[in-house]
Amino acid sequence: MRGGQRRASRLRPPTYRRRPPPAASILEVAPVQTQTLTQTDTAAGGAEPDAERGVLLAMPAQPGAGAALPHPGAPVDVPEHPEPPPPTRTESGGPSSDLFRQYLREIGRIPLLSAAEEVDLARRVEAGLFAEEKLRCSPGLDDRLALDLDRLVVLGRLAKRRLIEANLRLVVSVAKRYVGRGLTMLDLVQEGNLGLIRAVEKFDYARGYKFSTYATWWIRQAMSRALADQARTIRVPVHVVELINRVVRVQRRMLQERGCEPTPQEVAAHLDLAPERVGEVLRLAQEPVSLHAPVGEEDDVALGDLIEDGDAASPVESAAFLLLRQHLEAVLSTLGERERKVVQLRYGLADGRPRTLEEIGRLFGVTRERIRQIESKTLSKLRDHAYADQLRGYLD
């Protein structure tokens, strides 16, 4: 009998138990990638992660809310979105390049968003900003309404962070176009992330545009402003940098069309500017060069060694000054100690700084009139000296 039951059990098809479907929830937070990218902003939100989780569980379920954020195991409808580029040559080598590669790996793990998910997140961001403004401007709200607004603020911040993280690789893609203009890749990405945050706050989902199309403008604007403010050794105002870019673009276009370099007058006529203004802009467009920059292949000659010093005396002037000094010393050696000292102080022959009669009088303890008499007597004696004719030759 037992053998028959065993045979019957072998012939019976196996049965499987179905797992119960998961309960509906309003928001599923993206899986934690790294502590740097996905840690909760407790300082800005004013709530701990456990408190935010309690807020999410307390919210009633809404139709279609479960699709706001993709489940870790669910397939993601990947829209057209740039992939994180490989590190550039400027970022190769050194600890900063290792950090940048780690950053690329981290943002590459974050799942992208579909168009519907972007709209849903943007709607929550807008509701959170509205609730935050309402709480700030209306302090006399009842407790229940204030609690509901707090929930909207928390949900808005979570949606804002999710929308930012999903578009971090867009910033890296845009930053590739600005490499080599004065800022490193890390600095460009940092400035572009600030523009991305601004784009999330200003995005209007009701217009029907993709978020990446709208955010690209803000990212480029942030990078361009950073290049204008930080890229140059000598800072130039932003409006002057924009004018420089206009002049350079016109120069390049005219060079391609004509095959020769346009003159400042031609560029000024094309831009409806004064030729003097164009010349000044072209002068400001020049980049400074270090005087210690090596010249040649040997690297033993610096650029500063080849630049003429306009203030330096010529060899002829140096030789004439040396002869004049020798003749003056020969003439002054014929005077007394007091007379020689007065002439040297009066005309600055010792240190190059002439003294007044009062200053010399205080040094010798006599009046300025007495110093004037000594000076007059000494000059009369020098005029009749044998070297007087030689000294007059230096006056020509």
UniProtKB/Swiss-Prot annotation:
Coiled coil: none annotated. SUPFAM superfamilies: Sigma2 domain of RNA polymerase sigma factors, Sigma3 and sigma4 domains of RNA polymerase sigma factors. A motif (Polymerase core binding) lies at residues 187-200. It comes from the Bacteria. Keywords: DNA-binding, Sigma factor, Transcription, Transcription regulation. Belongs to the sigma-70 factor family. Interacts transiently with the RNA polymerase catalytic core. Interacts with RNA polymerase-binding protein RbpA. This is RNA polymerase principal sigma factor HrdA. It comes from Streptomyces coelicolor (strain ATCC BAA-471 / A3(2) / M145).
